[in-house]
Curated annotation (Swiss-Prot):
Residue stretch of the organelle transit peptide: 1-14
Name of the featured protein: Translation factor GUF1, mitochondrial
Keyword Membrane carried by entry: yes
Keyword Acetylation: no
Signal peptide (residue range): none
NCBIfam families, per the entry: lepA, small_GTP
Catalysed conversion reaction: GTP + H2O = GDP + phosphate + H(+)
Domain named tr-type G: residues: 46-227
Amino acid sequence: MLRKAFRYLVPVRCKSNSSIAGASTAGTSPSLPQTLQRRIEEIPLERYRNFSIVAHVDHGKSTLSDRLLELTGVVKPGAKQVLDKLEVERERGITVKAQTCSMFYHDKRTGLDYLLHLVDTPGHVDFRSEVSRSYASCGGALLLVDASQGVQAQTVANFYLAYSMNLKLLPVINKIDLSVANIAQAEDQVEDMFELPREDIVRVSAKTGLNVADLLPAIVDRIPPPTGYVEKPFRALLVDSWYDSYLGVVLLVYCVDGMVKKGDKIVSAHTSNKYEVKEVGIMYPERVATGKLSTGQVGYLVPGFKNSRDAKIGDTLMHQGRESETEVLPGFEEQKPMVFVGAFPADGAEFKALDDDIQRLVLNDRSVTLQRETSNALGQGWRLGFLGSLHASVFKERLENEYGSKLIITQPTVPYVVEYSDGTQITVTNPDDFPDLTLRRTKIKNFQEPYVEAIMTLPQDYLGRVITLCDDNRGIQKEITYINTTGQVMLKYDIPLAHLVDDFFGKLKSVTHGYASLDYEDAGYKPSDIVKMELLVNGKGVDALAQVMHRSQTERVAKEWVRKFKQYVKSQLYEVVIQAKANNKVLARETIKARRKDVLAKLHASDVSRRKKLLVKQKEGKKQMRSIGNVHIDQEAYQAFLRK
């Protein structure tokens, strides 16, 4: 059913594969690299299997990865979240970076050894680009479905992404040990929605290990080996990169053709820069230097450069002197950020150190865009672009966890398009750059805002509430599909991206008591009546707090803003007026009364002339202070206001 609707679902943005910053061979047996390389050399290319695990978030991908690593002897039994290497992943229980690991499997049916390469991919839609980059090195994928929840929105999206890249799909029903598991229903969904044969489905419990051993022969039998030529010149696809404080930049590559060894001279097709390979090896699950990589393998190499900008994801690496006979690989589609925030150091003195930390983290997450900006209120900072609001939140958390850096993050904004009367267009990602009212009246034809096609699956009991939620967020209904076998319904709405990033998923979870799932695709731009909202303190705009929004939201938001900001501004020696303004019209106002200083405290009661003179002087002083508008606002006030 859904396979036939493929033309309506556009594959999502594209991105990366592994993080593993700081991993090394330290602590491993000295003989391990030689042992692994000897085993690899004994296995021909036709017995390689590169595969990933894709599913909706929380359907058990990382747990299943742990069990496969145990069965193949990579880790000891009982290991948890082996491939979730980031602290934020372990804390949140989600996969943020796609992680890789090589495994050896001995097939008892034939007595043959196989080299398996596993990629554990993220499930959340903000990290879909991690999934698509992972697919570039894979011949197939395990499509994982939770037996208790069935097919969810991101299951559908992941299926079509894999289908569009011609991957062989192996359906797996997980969590069959749960008392609420409905295995037959999940099988019906897989068969009806994806047209995958019921007899191909493997039923497992990743948590208990039940039937997981049956997956390995299924992977060997149903997923094809890599297509490449050992005798051709070396050609590798740069899939990901990260920074190691000792080695510098480390590259994760998929060796498409030929072979690369330590000491080889290689060249980048993108930059034409030449390097010598300082170290090369596989992930097992940490870095293990094996001395070389051959056709079909996914591993790492250390090119010996320190500048993170030299590592372009999707680049083709080849041997020096063989450039003319080596075809450049197509690479990946460039990332398009969907959410932008202003980021400023909590302590202005930390700007330089924080800039270095951000540059290193961006190396490991190339979907983040970065440019410098300056705020009158918050000082020097950056305008950062992300794939979604969760992506922005995780980036901030990683910066704090991995580098100890503290940031002030402004409200997220989305890229708006301004079309002028002469036909030219500009994209505005910073509210400060939004055109003023005089231009709007004379030179601007229209404003356009980005929309997404939101795909939601939910129980039919909550349909009315979700439709109301979508209508309240200016959604445009496109399609309702009733999934008869499950009592579920699938909704498709076009929703403004600005509303999606304003915790739409949290609101959806709230009205459905956690039973809804959400996925979304870019749906282009639509004309819209949008305006810039500013917060003014004594008539001066606070640039860091400005936002662009639909005109219908302005009155409600204006009242919320002034009421909230008043809580965090301390009283001054003169009156402080807080206003919210949009389209040159003040929509809301709050006043903080002046804090009176008793200048007469030390005077004698009978000294009337001196009394009058001091009161007049105080009045003139307050008038001068008010005209300057020098209101002192603590950094904590901005942080508290920007906090949800």
